[in-house]
């Protein structure tokens, strides 16, 4: 416990909270252009080919973001919407690409959790 004199001389230091998605600059989403679309492998103990894209954002940041869902239509120069949110088993991937927005189509034939994958409501028979 500091004395009053110590507090007068030094004061309390405020803890600085570090952002988990610095490239967003406090925005909910950011637009960007894909510079590279590729697959990568997750860290142990998982095994797969995860689809990721390197995206140059409108604020100049270059980030690696994850493409969720089964199948996608992304290529180089595709314009995408990026949101925060990391992928636990892919080191360095701290962003997600929003499905069904701008150049990225929603997941085809998706019946459940449709809003997360940009899928339209199926036609009722």
Swiss-Prot record:
Protein name in UniProt: Small ribosomal subunit protein uS12
Keyword rRNA-binding part of the UniProt annotation: yes
Role according to the record: With S4 and S5 plays an important role in translational accuracy.
Organism in which the protein naturally occurs: Delftia acidovorans (strain DSM 14801 / SPH-1)
Region spans: Disordered: 105-125
Coiled coil: none
UniProt xrefs under Gene3D superfamilies: Nucleic acid-binding proteins
A Pfam family it matches: Ribosom_S12_S23
């Amino acid at each position: 416990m500091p004395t009053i004199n110590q507090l007068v001389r030094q004061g309390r230091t405020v803890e600085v909270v570090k952002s988990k998605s610095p490239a967003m600059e406090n925005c909910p989403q950011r637009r960007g252009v894909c510079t590279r679309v590729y697959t990568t492998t997750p860290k142990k103990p998982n095994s797969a080919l995860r689809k990721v894209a390197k995206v140059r954002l409108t604020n100049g940041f270059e980030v690696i973001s994850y493409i969720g869902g089964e199948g996608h239509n992304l290529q180089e120069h595709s314009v995408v919407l990026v949101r925060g949110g990391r992928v636990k088993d892919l080191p360095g991937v701290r962003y997600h690409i929003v499905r069904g927005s701008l150049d990225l189509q929603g997941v085809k034939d998706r019946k459940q959790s449709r809003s997360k994958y940009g899928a339209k409501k199926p036609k009722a028979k």
